[in-house]
């Protein structure tokens, strides 16, 4: 994963001292810290896209797989396994991606919001895509429910879109994440930073059991 060079800032918070993408200002990392206390992290399985490199479909000569295009199904698979436990062991990132392909939901980039909602419904999960306020996001996570976040250019993606899963809150009110494409799981993010880097008008999918 991404190797983070950290420096201890004068305020004794560990601050990343670089921007991983050239088009993203290091100031965007302000307030991102190494999570000192992860007691608020929900017991969510950690799955990575790069563990699923097998081609699922070829579109215009391009081989597509969970590795290239499955951040959405990987984020959703983690959520399904969290909510449904052993009964959802078949809900792997590649199985969900294959389902999306079979159902004609996949056109060559990532999956859209409605596709992820349709797949979630198979597992009796309710989804609501919202703009998300700081208070609602924190309350939702503290209640033990997950949020899929569709991130735009910034810390999680260079120029396209990328889905991550919000999986908890630190005692000082920052958000813990499972990123299916990196090992940024040791970091805690200010809610406003996630809101600012949202890809769409309604980038947050609030998940809960039906």
Question: Which residues does each predicted region cover?
Answer:
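Active-site-adjacent substructure of cysteine-protease-like catalytic cores
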Residues: 129-176, 186, 209
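Noncatalytic regulatory segments and standalone regulatory/sensor domains
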Residues: 19, 23, 30, 36-38, ...
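Hydrophobic/aromatic residues in well-formed alpha-helices
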Residues: 93-96, 116, 137, 194
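Mid-length scaffold segments of soluble, non-membrane domains
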Residues: 97-132, 142
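Active-site-adjacent structural segments surrounding the nucleophilic cysteine of cysteine proteases
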Residues: 1-105, 153
């Amino acid at each position: 994963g991404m190797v983070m060079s950290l420096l201890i800032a004068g305020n004794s918070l560990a601050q990343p001292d670089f921007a991983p993408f050239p088009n993203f200002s290091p100031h965007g990392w302000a307030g991102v810290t190494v999570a000192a206390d992860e007691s608020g992290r929900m017991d969510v399985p950690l799955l990575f896209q790069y563990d699923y490199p097998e081609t699922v479909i070829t579109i215009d000569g391009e081989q597509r797989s969970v590795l290239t295009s499955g951040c959405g199904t990987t984020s959703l698979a983690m959520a399904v396994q969290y909510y449904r436990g052993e009964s959802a062991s078949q809900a792997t990132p590649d199985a969900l991606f294959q389902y999306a392909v079979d159902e004609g939901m996949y056109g060559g980039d990532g999956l859209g919001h409605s596709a992820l909602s349709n797949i979630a419904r198979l597992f009796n999960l309710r989804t609501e895509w919202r703009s998300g306020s700081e208070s609602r996001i924190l309350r939702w996570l503290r209640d033990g429910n997950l949020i899929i976040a569709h991130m735009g250019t910034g810390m999680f993606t260079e120029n396209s879109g990328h889905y991550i899963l919000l999986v908890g809150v630190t005692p000082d009110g920052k958000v813990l994440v499972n990123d299916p494409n990196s090992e940024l799981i040791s970091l805690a993010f200010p809610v406003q930073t996630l809101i600012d880097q949202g890809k769409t008008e309604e980038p947050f999918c609030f998940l809960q059991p039906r």
